[in-house]
């Protein structure tokens, strides 16, 4: 997944995190450099909303000047995917990297070298 995120970043995609974690996320972020790939993040403990509540997805958009219709949300839980879709975001359920790459290629009409 890290390799894929790096490729997306190098291709000009902006990457944002949206998590239901508590403030312990900051200790995790210090340990794993994958978080440095993100252009921003919304953490539920700071926003007082959690996925799949509509407000947290919209907070991400408001905070970073994004339009829901121009966002692709990815999660490994269908309930969160449906929450994102309810805001107008395109959303994909993550099951495997291979399937995820297929979905990105389909949605954006691009080819990602594997």
Predicted regions and their residues:
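Conserved phosphate-coupling serine/threonine residues in phosphotransfer and NTP-handling enzymes
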Residues: 19
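Asp-based, Mg2+/Mn2+-dependent phosphohydrolase catalytic module
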Residues: 6, 22, 29-114
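Short, acidic loop-to-helix structural element flanking the phosphoryl-transfer center
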Residues: 1-16, 54
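Short low-complexity stretches enriched in small and charged residues
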Residues: 1, 25-28
């Amino acid at each position: 997944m890290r390799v894929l995120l790096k490729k997306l970043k190098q291709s000009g995609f902006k990457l944002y995190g949206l998590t239901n974690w508590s403030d312990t996320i900051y200790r995790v972020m210090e340990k794993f450099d994958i978080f440095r790939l993100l252009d921003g993040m919304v953490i539920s403990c700071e926003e007082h909303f959690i996925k799949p509540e509509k407000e947290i997805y919209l907070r991400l958009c408001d905070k970073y000047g994004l339009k829901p219709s121009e966002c692709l949300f990815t999660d490994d839980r269908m309930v969160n995917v449906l929450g994102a879709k309810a805001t107008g975001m395109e959303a994909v359920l993550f099951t495997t990297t291979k399937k995820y790459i297929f979905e990105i290629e389909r949605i954006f009409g691009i080819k990602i070298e594997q």
